[in-house]
Amino acid sequence: MSSPNVLIGDPIKKDSRFRGNDKSMAKKINLTLKIWRQKNCKTPGKFEIYKTQGIDVDMSFLEMLDVLNEKLTKEGKEPIAFDHDCREGICGTCGAVINGQPHGPQRGTTLCQLHMRNFKDGETLVIEPWRAKGFPINKDLSVDRSAFDRIINAGGFISVKTGQAPDAHSLPVPKENADIAMDAAQCIGCGACVAACPNGSAMLFVGAKVSHLNQLPQGAPEKKTRVLNMVSQMDKEGFGNCSNAYECEAACPKEISVVHIAHMNRDYRQVNLP
């Protein structure tokens, strides 16, 4: 195999074949951030304005907040609280509304995977937490999403026999059902659907969890009680009803379809038939 034609003693970075787009890598932008600050859910909050300069366009949105928090800490000010964990778009922990859009302007992307190149130099960003009765504010941009955990506890599980693992293909699953279940299982429980819905409804989240399990034979034993208990718990948590605005599907970082709400409604009606 022939080696690259690079002069001995010259750093590889001087060869254009080993270098990225210098213009893109060097680009910096300045932003005005209008961020919601609130001590807790019992105290009133307000917007505070921060000027950020020299933000690398290749940063993620959360990395930009890290830079801002480091600056605030050095100045002896309270850093901005926000939820985050894996920063890989998997866990569903992060989330904020940017200029009225949950997770920001890029479709099918979580906040932690949103890059600053999606914004323009000199732009003003209004950053708010998820706003819904079922998501009380912990602090600043951080909200309490334990309501989702309680909905899962109400029926988002299956019953299995203990002991040895079952043989492969012992429970045949039609491909159509498997595809529907896999699509629904992509839900990471971030809450963007609730934040986007004008009614603060959690129907897409609950529909995805119900559809995921009810499509599979493993979920059959609790199929009836699952949909009843999870919908009932959703109502108890104070989430609104679905009015087919479809904002949930548009905001979902995994682009989960509202067809799963239809599947849940179908199962719910079948259980309640005389």
Region locations from a protein language model:
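Eukaryote-biased recognition of intrinsically disordered, low-complexity regulatory segments
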Residues: 28-50
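Short, structured protein-protein interaction patches enriched in aromatics and acidic/basic residues
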Residues: 81-93
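Glycine-rich phosphate/adenylate-binding loop and adjacent beta-alpha elements
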Residues: 98-122, 127
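Intrinsic disorder/low-complexity segments
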Residues: 1-25
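Short strand-turn-strand beta-turns centered on an Asx-Gly dipeptide
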Residues: 36, 52-53, 98-100
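Short, contiguous acidic and Ser/Thr-rich linear segments
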Residues: 48-59
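Ferredoxin-type iron-sulfur electron-transfer modules in oxidoreductases and energy-metabolism complexes
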Residues: 59-78, 126-274
